[in-house]
């Protein structure tokens, strides 16, 4: 009888979830169409009408596609992996980052870890050495020290040149993987077409203030909704440096180019003649692959191969330290803007050869982002000058409501806290500000950059990273 009661309760819960999901879907698709009609009626401009229709189509496409996304489950696939952690000025966290990797459940006999200190000016190297001495797996850990700062791409190249095994896992030096993250991250590589996999990022320091919490829920949206959509078609545009995995052979040509900029001790990477004559060494592409934005460059090259797929694993969770000051956040967004530009230009060379849905996702998203500054300026400044205040009000109301829908669907799919809804609505104003300032500046200064994603190396994580893996707030769907 007890079993029957439990079964009945489970059926009621399942029915309730289906009803809730149905209501969210109805609200999402119905309201998006209403928003499009409001935007179209609010302005007589052809460009605004075209943008509104394109944005509506993209949102509907995204929600339909991401609804069918599911991560790969564990089937016992355990390839040999090399975990790479490039670091600069991370004395407060580097030991904990290394420990979380070895505290995971991936077989240590099939895992090697390489940590690169890229010319740190603090005590990062000493922290790496302490982790090596204290680890029972020190024979699986290799430390590399650059006497001066060469940049993240050279740090990656130094390690990948020495990597063993088929799969290379890259982890940022301020990011902490869950116990099962690496095990779940490599599962899609059972498919020989998969060249790269992105993990799912969250903010470990979301309780430090409003800005970190805003970023936490924004990450949930960008990973689960956007990458979930892209993953359906095998065209994830960026494997985040927080946690990403690549087939080593798929990225060797770029690593060869990056290694040339590093220490003379860096071993040459053997490439065949065809690879040496690949597009990485010619024209604009040669400059782009040596620009900031390593994550997008690696992803673009991995995806460029014939039949290549790049996917996302929502169940492979990494928790990163996000900026807790506006200055750090804006610097990060500037670097990401430039990286997006470089990765987008590279993708123009090959995305047209992918499937129609993959090409549509890529080119339409780029079209909408490139036009976004002009659209925001028109709605917020030009339209009011013409006396069409209701048009501006309709634009703001519609944009905020889209933020509401993103927060609601993130809660639905990723099972975040329901507070993701109001926080995502608040983030709309942050997005508008970034579009009018950082994004525009990044468009006209695409070649500047450096190690801009690191905060200041002063974070202490003893209170943020317990000895056991922190309890998941999310339950990957």
PLM features: residue spans?
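Membrane-helix boundary/interface segments in integral membrane proteins
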Residues: 1-12, 347-350, 374-381
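N-proximal low-complexity "stem/linker" segments adjacent to membrane-targeting elements
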Residues: 3-96
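Loop-to-transmembrane boundary segments
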Residues: 10-21, 355-368
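Membrane-embedded multi-pass helical conduit in multi-pass membrane proteins
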Residues: 34-67, 73-76, 362-449
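Non-transmembrane catalytic domains and loops of membrane-associated enzymes and transporters
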Residues: 75-351, 474-476
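Cytosolic juxtamembrane regulatory segments of multi-pass membrane proteins
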Residues: 82-94, 430-442, 461-476
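Membrane-interface alpha-helices
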Residues: 315, 444-471
């Amino acid at each position: 009888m007890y079993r029957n009661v439990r079964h009945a309760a489970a059926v009621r819960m399942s029915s309730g979830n289906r009803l809730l999901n149905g209501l969210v879907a109805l609200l999402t698709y119905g309201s998006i169409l209403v928003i499009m009609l409001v935007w179209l009626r609010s302005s007589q401009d052809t460009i605004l009408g075209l943008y509104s229709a394109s944005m509506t189509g993209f949102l509907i496409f995204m929600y339909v596609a991401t609804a069918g996304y599911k991560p790969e489950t564990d089937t016992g696939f355990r390839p040999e992996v090399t975990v790479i952690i490039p670091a600069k000025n991370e004395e407060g966290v580097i030991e904990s980052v290394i420990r979380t990797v070895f505290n995971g459940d991936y077989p240590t006999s099939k895992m090697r870890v390489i940590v690169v200190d890229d010319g740190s000016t603090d005590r990062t190297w000493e922290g790496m050495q302490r982790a090596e001495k204290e680890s029972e797996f020190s024979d699986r850990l290799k430390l590399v020290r650059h006497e001066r700062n060469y940049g993240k791409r050279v740090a990656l190249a130094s390690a990948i040149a020495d990597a063993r095994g088929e799969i290379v896992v890259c982890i940022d030096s301020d990011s902490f993987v869950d116990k099962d993250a690496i095990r779940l991250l490599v599962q899609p590589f059972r498919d020989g077409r998969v060249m790269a996999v992105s993990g799912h990022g969250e903010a470990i320091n979301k309780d430090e203030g409003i800005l970190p919490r805003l970023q936490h829920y924004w990450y949930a949206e960008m990973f689960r909704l956007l990458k979930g959509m892209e993953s359906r078609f095998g065209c994830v545009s960026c494997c985040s440096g927080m946690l990403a995995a690549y087939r080593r052979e798929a990225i060797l040509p770029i690593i060869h180019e990056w290694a040339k900029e590093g220490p003379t001790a860096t071993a040459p990477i053997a490439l065949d003649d065809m690879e040496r004559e690949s597009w990485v060494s010619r024209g604009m592409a040669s400059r782009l692959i040596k620009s900031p934005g390593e994550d997008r460059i690696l992803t673009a090259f991995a995806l460029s191969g014939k039949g290549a797929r790049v996917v996302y694993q929502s169940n492979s969770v990494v928790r990163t330290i996000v900026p807790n000051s506006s200055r750090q956040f804006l610097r990060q967004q500037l670097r990401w803007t430039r990286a997006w530009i470089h990765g987008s230009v590279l993708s123009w060379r090959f995305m047209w050869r992918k499937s129609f849905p993959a090409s549509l996702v890529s080119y339409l998203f780029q079209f909408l982002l490139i036009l976004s500054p002009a659209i925001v300026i028109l709605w917020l400044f030009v339209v009011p000058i013409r006396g069409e205040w209701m048009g501006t009000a309709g634009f703001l109301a519609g944009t905020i409501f889209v933020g509401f829908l993103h927060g609601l669907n993130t809660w639905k799919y990723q099972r975040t806290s329901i507070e993701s809804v109001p926080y995502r609505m608040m983030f709309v104003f942050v997005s508008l500000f970034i579009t009018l300032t950082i994004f525009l500046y990044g468009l006209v200064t695409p070649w500047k950059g450096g190690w801009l994603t690191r905060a200041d190396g002063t974070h202490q994580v003893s209170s943020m990273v317990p000895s056991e893996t922190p309890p998941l707030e999310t339950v990957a769907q």
